[in-house]
Swiss-Prot record:
It catalyses: 7-aminomethyl-7-carbaguanine + guanosine(34) in tRNA = 7-aminomethyl-7-carbaguanosine(34) in tRNA + guanine. Residues 252-258, 276-280 are annotated as: RNA binding. Belongs to the queuine tRNA-ribosyltransferase family. It comes from Lactococcus lactis subsp. lactis (strain IL1403) (Streptococcus lactis). GO terms for molecular function: metal ion binding; tRNA-guanosine(34) queuine transglycosylase activity. The lineage of its organism: Bacteria, Bacillati, Bacillota, Bacilli, Lactobacillales. Its cofactor is Zn(2+). Its EC number is 2.4.2.29. The active site is at D96 (proton acceptor), D271 (nucleophile). Pfam families: TGT. It is an enzyme of class 2 (transferase). Binds 1 zinc ion per subunit. This is Queuine tRNA-ribosyltransferase. One of its GO terms (biological process) is queuosine biosynthetic process. One of its GO terms (cellular component) is cytosol.
Amino acid sequence: MTEHAIKYRLIKKEKHTGARLGEIITPHGTFPTPMFMPVGTQATVKTMSPEELKTLGSGIILSNTYHLWLRPGDELVAEAGGLHKFMNWDQPILTDSGGFQVYSLVQNKKNITEEGVKFKSHLDGRELFLNPEKAISIQNNLGSDIMMSFDECPPFYQPYDYVKASVERTSRWAERGLNAHRRPNDQGLFGIVQGAGFEDLRRQSARDLTSMDFAGYSIGGLAVGESHKEMNAVLDFTTPMLPEDKPRYLMGVGAPDSLIDGVIRGVDMFDCVLPTRIARNGTLMTHFGRVNIRNAKYEHDFTPLDPMCDCYTCTNYTRAYLRHLIKADETFGLRLCSYHNLHFLVNLMKDVRGAIMDDNLLEFREDFCERYGYNQPNAKDF
C-alpha cells in the first residue's frame, strides 16, 4: 500500500445518518470536512482575492486542468513554481482532470477511443487530444494537492450498454493514470466512480477503483441533468461501496439541499461554480431562500441582504445598494454578491459540521429547508 500524500482522519460519525465529521491532511495544510470548495477555474475564484477566500473560511479551492492547460499552459505554471506560488494561495488546491470540459466539447462519440479523446478548443477551435497520461502530466506540472483521474462522464440518461462500456474504459484509464503519476509523495490522486443511475455499474466501478489504492474517491456523473431524488438514490448505494478511511468527493454539486443530503449520505467534499455564477446575475442565497436582487421590490429596501448572515456584504451594505450596483453592471456589485454566496455555502457547511457534532443533522436539515423554501409546493431548486 502506498503512503499517500493525502490522509483522511475521521473525528465522529453522526448517530442518525451516514454523515461524518473529519479532516483531510494535505501538503499545504489541513481542512475540516464536510467542506464546500469554491471553484477557481482559471487559477482565480471569479472577483475574489485569495485573502478574501481565507477570511470567509474556504480551506481548499478547486482549479481546472483543461483551462489552465490551454491558458497560460501547465509548463508556465510549473516554471512559476506551481499553482500555489503562481496564484499566491498557500492552502490546499484540488484540480479536476479536464474530462468534464472535454466531453462538453466532443462533437462525435467516435472521438472517444481507448487511447483518449479528440476535441476542439473552446478558445480557437484547434483540434486537441487528451488522454489519462496527459491529464496526469498536466496536473503534476500544476502541483495541486489533490488530483483527479481522467474519466469519461456520460450524461445520466444513456443506454445501459453505453454506460457499461464507459465504466470499463474509465477503470482502464484510471489504472493508466495511476501508473503515469510522477509525484505520489506530494500529490494525492483520486479515482472517479461512474455508472450513471445503474447500481450494478456503480458497484463495478467502485470495485475496480478501490482495488487500485487511490488516495481518495470521487463520485462523478451526477448533477448532469438527473433529479434531486435520483441523485440521492445513487448516493444511497454508492457511498457505502467506498472505503471509510479515505475522502469521498461529490463532484459539481452546490445547491444547499444537495450539499446537506450528500453529507447525510457520507460525502466529505463538494464543489460547484454555482455561488459565483448566479451572483453575476444578481441571484443570492439567503437563509430565507433565494433573492433576485434585480427585482424592483428591492429598489427602496435599505435592510441587509440576509439578517442571519454576518458576512462583509450583509454587515455593510443594503439590498437597495446591491440592486443599484448589479443594475449598473458595477464590478463591486459582482464582488459583493460573489462574496456573500461563497460565505453562505462555506458557512452552511460549518453549521452542518456543528450539527454532526451535536447528532441533530436531520433536525438541522428540516429547519434549514423549511426556512429556505424547499418544502413549499412551489419551491424552486437552483
